[in-house]
Amino acid sequence: MERSHIRDVDPDAADALSSERQRQEDTLAMIASENHVSEAVLEAQGSALTNKYAEGYPGERYYAGCEYADEIESLAIERAEELWGAEHVNVQPHSGTQANMAVYLTALDPGDKILSLDLTHGGHLSHGHPANFTGQTYTVEQYEVDPETGYIDYEGLKTKADEFNPDIIVSGYSAYPREVEFERIQEAADLADAYHLADIAHITGLVAAGVHTSPVGVADFVTGSTHKTIRAGRGGIIMCNEEHADDIDNSVFPGAQGGPLMHNVAGKAVGFKEALSDEFEAYAEQTVKNAEELANTLTDAGLSVVSGGTDNHLVLVDLRPSHPETTGKEVEAALESAGIIMNANTVPGETRSAFNPSGIRVGTPALTTRGFTESTVREVGELMIELIDDPTDDEAIAAVSDRVDTLTDEYPLYR
């Protein structure tokens, strides 16, 4: 993408933007929360809508000149309703976390109780971590995965819900590789007479394509990100039934935000249009197949894959059983040097710190966008294993880097 206008006024920024694009083209993105949107979505997010304030909602704006903002937002809403089958959709949240904030504003008062999955077991900061506003505003108790299986302990969750009596139970996770049984979590919510928030930030695309169970129609509120597995404009989304529609809309604006980022809403509209295609369904199916192949490859090499595999787009590896002296950060750094971008991650029963944890999290959404299938993903897994076995081997890093260069040339991005 030519950036001549930026280069004319700010060569430094133009260089950084061009370098970032080149970095993405020349490396393999395996951070589970990242993906590559289409040129069409990029174009929408860089459109003149970035200039437009549109406080309010379609047909009910606080400013004049919003006819095309209304049109774009209405398209995004209609397409989201079709994708996920929701009665009501709000596409204005700036992020998944702000979508969660709006739900909390709707359902809770300060001091009310949240029951959510522990962060080291696959939860998320916005579900009640002490460093997050949720942990500072609400009373939080957390449930865990079964230490033997790595699966959510649904019976333990019901017991904890009965004892803790939460006002809301949060499902949906940032590092949980198995399919979520939303109806079983709803049983726990019913037992406690609590709301149920399903945060599907990571799996919005998988749910839309029908390759993961949907919480829509089960949970009271469903939130998500719109730039991960769904490959739309960056931001968040909220879905609910009509009973909560007005409260949710008021919690987003004016409760949590001012004007929506209309250029991002445009990117959501375009990405949702793409996701309504048969090609997107095939993409989501391949994403899961690729993750399963990656999990099998790592398992075959003797690594400990949390829960024994995956049902979605990500694989979580506990390095301690096979490589007790190796940290996730050491593996992350070695792989980055070779052009494979993933992240160190905490694992259930973590014995190190969040800054230098014992695990790694890898995902296949971006590789699948590039056109990778099982055979190519298996090769990437084998390359990863070479550096996991010795993250300090410079010759191995160089050899893996050469192979990554070949793969990125064979499966180009934005060319």
UniProtKB/Swiss-Prot annotation:
Q: Does the keyword Transferase apply?
A: yes
Per the record, what are the reactions this protein catalyses? (6R)-5,10-methylene-5,6,7,8-tetrahydrofolate + glycine + H2O = (6S)-5,6,7,8-tetrahydrofolate + L-serine
Q: Where is the composition biased (Basic and acidic residues)?
A: 1-10
Highest taxon listed in the record's lineage: Archaea
Gene3D superfamilies assigned? Aspartate Aminotransferase, domain 1 (3.90.1150.10), Type I PLP-dependent aspartate aminotransferase-like (Major domain) (3.40.640.10)
Q: Which residues carry this modification: N6-(pyridoxal phosphate)lysine?
A: 228
A single BP term in Gene Ontology: tetrahydrofolate interconversion
Which pathway is this protein engaged in?
One-carbon metabolism; tetrahydrofolate interconversion; Amino-acid biosynthesis; glycine biosynthesis; glycine from L-serine: step 1/1
Chain positions of site Plays an important role in substrate specificity: 227
Pfam entry (one)? SHMT
Print the keywords alphabetically: Amino-acid biosynthesis, Cytoplasm, One-carbon metabolism, Pyridoxal phosphate, Transferase
- The UniProt annotation places (6S)-5,6,7,8-tetrahydrofolate binding at 119, 123-125, 353-355
Q: Which cofactor does it need?
A: pyridoxal 5'-phosphate
Q: One MF term in GO for this entry?
A: glycine hydroxymethyltransferase activity
Indicate where this protein resides in the cell. Answer: Cytoplasm
* GO cellular component assignments: cytoplasm
Q: What is its EC number?
A: 2.1.2.1
Region annotation Disordered: where it falls in the sequence? 1-21
- Which positions are tagged coiled coil? none
Question: What transmembrane ranges does the database entry give?
Answer: none
Q: What is the similarity comment for this entry?
A: Belongs to the SHMT family.
**HAMAP family for the chain:** SHMT (MF_00051)
| Purpose of the protein | Catalyzes the reversible interconversion of serine and glycine with tetrahydrofolate (THF) serving as the one-carbon carrier. Also exhibits THF-independent aldolase activity toward beta-hydroxyamino acids, producing glycine and aldehydes, via a retro-aldol mechanism.
Q: How does it assemble?
A: Homodimer.
What is this protein's name? Serine hydroxymethyltransferase
Q: Which organism is it from?
A: Haloquadratum walsbyi (strain DSM 16790 / HBSQ001)
